[in-house]
Amino acid sequence: ISGKSMIERLLLELSPLVAQVVVIRAPGQTIPNIPKELKDRTLLGWDSVKDRGPLQGIVDALPLLNAEIDKVFLLTCDLPYITTNWFQNLKDVMTDEFDMVCTEENEIVNPLLAIYRRPVLEPASKLISAGKRRPISLWEGWRMARLSAPNETPWICRDVNTPEEFKKAKT
């Protein structure tokens, strides 16, 4: 999109707001192009067990993340419309009264376009051991705020799941 991969574009939009980035990829997946302004604060990892989904990514990412970082963006890589302003909105809503802020579209909450307090993510390994695979399993007992896309830009939080959606995102 505009000459950049979706992950590269996502990282560029996120970069002004974060001290560190951890990118987790599936075993055998190509190493993404990391923007030069992020190279010194980006770590690459991979799923230590394949086909376990986002929870495995969380398990493998947390040890790579600086221990002082308490608020963690958890993002899917296929967000072609996302902006720095949207990430800032998520961050602004994350006040002391919430443990996570997730985006919501048509009453569907997206756990992979969200910001979490680190303790919310730490039980991921136990959930995998219990046979869970979905990040929503992390939510129980925590306080969540939901943030919907503005009416003037309803597409901002949409991800890409089909070749047709990808083609549309490139235009």
Where are the model-predicted features located?
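Nucleotide and nucleotide-moiety/phosphate-recognizing core
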Residues: 1-132, 140-156, 163-164
